[in-house]
């Protein structure tokens, strides 16, 4: 696959039109807004930076790097172990359901894009979108850092668009937020990908509480 094709594949994977349900979940933000924890753009940016620094950089990216290497080596046992670890790091039923639902949706895409994906790997990809992204990145020969950029941009954009609906704020403010959050992501991503095993784990208790409370929130825009 040429460099141009690989870049276009990355854009497709980061697209908001990718049918994996990214915009269906708020990851606790909806409750945080109702509770008065996030009331304006500045509070949203602080909230999202905390989720990135103490969650995405310490769980998602380090585990994505391990899944990618397991896929490179064809080590299904290691990939299964790290996927199970990822699900264990999702601290609420809602977050685990999101992970599994996104994985199942991505696996359906994978069946169309790469129908020769071996059944054990396809079954694993159904449990987590990160596993599917890792397998596909290796198959399409897209390097780990580039895949991580696509993954991060998709996560940032989904979070900001949830903020637009919930906080709320306008599209111009949203684009400024995406720029700043992307700058922070790009600066810290290499360190997160290289994190040792002992550093893996989240430290976002408020996000976990918000997600748990969202499961029984009276009126919701987002899935639970």
Swiss-Prot record:
Chief location of this protein within or outside the cell: cytoplasm
Gene3D superfamilies: Urease accessory protein UreF
Keyword tags: Chaperone, Cytoplasm, Nickel insertion
One Gene Ontology cellular component: cytoplasm
A Gene Ontology molecular function term of the record: nickel cation binding
Record localization: Cytoplasm
Region (Required for interaction with the urease apoprotein-UreDG complex): 210-224
Pfam families referenced in this protein's UniProt entry, alphabetically: UreF
Effect of loss of the gene: Cells do not express urease.
Subunit composition and interactions: UreD, UreF and UreG form a complex that acts as a GTP-hydrolysis-dependent molecular chaperone, activating the urease apoprotein by helping to assemble the nickel containing metallocenter of UreC. The UreE protein probably delivers the nickel.
Function: Required for maturation of urease via the functional incorporation of the urease nickel metallocenter.
Further comment: The artificial UreEF fusion protein binds to UreD-UreABC apoprotein complex, and UreG can also bind to this. The UreF portion seems to function normally in nickel transfer, while the UreE function is impaired in the fusion.
Membership in a protein family: Belongs to the UreF family.
HAMAP family (UniProt xref): UreF
Protein name (Swiss-Prot/TrEMBL): Urease accessory protein UreF
